[in-house]
């Protein structure tokens, strides 16, 4: 899915999905499970559910944590032929972190950076440091590890489908469902989606006043920072 084969395919993780959240335990477990399966002819790593938004653009509906982890592991293995075909909708820092990996800038998604470091540690601890062992693991991961890709039909009601997916496994919190329903109304409008994402992220961080989280604070809250000077969502400034 990530090989640089000349086919320009992009997997986009939509705004309603959680940030990347796999920790040391999950990443170690996955790498160990794959390593324990080296003698098998194939290893199925899970299921990916997507919705085709454009000719070669797939919106990830389910499986984004696992898909992102696969990408992180490939980068941690130092495989240079991996195409940059995974990104985040309306999350510039996360998208930039994925794109620049393993060379992270000052602005970075901590969850993704931590995941990369955990993957590096796990590879060293489980696979070892011998070139032959690492090469064997790389070859298996690239050629024998498979993910089942299910593409949702075009006529499917995504709101309903998302609710069904959420009824199994680890359920979303109520505020995450609200976020999904609101963002669904903005699909197709990248500028509006980006605005919504920044507003939501600023409001969801309860450790700061919202004025401290928005660079456009004087435009939105006035010079005293105590007013609300815009009258509609359309007036909220774009980041561009």
Enumerate the language-model features and the residues they cover:
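Covalent nucleotidyltransferase
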Residues: 1-240
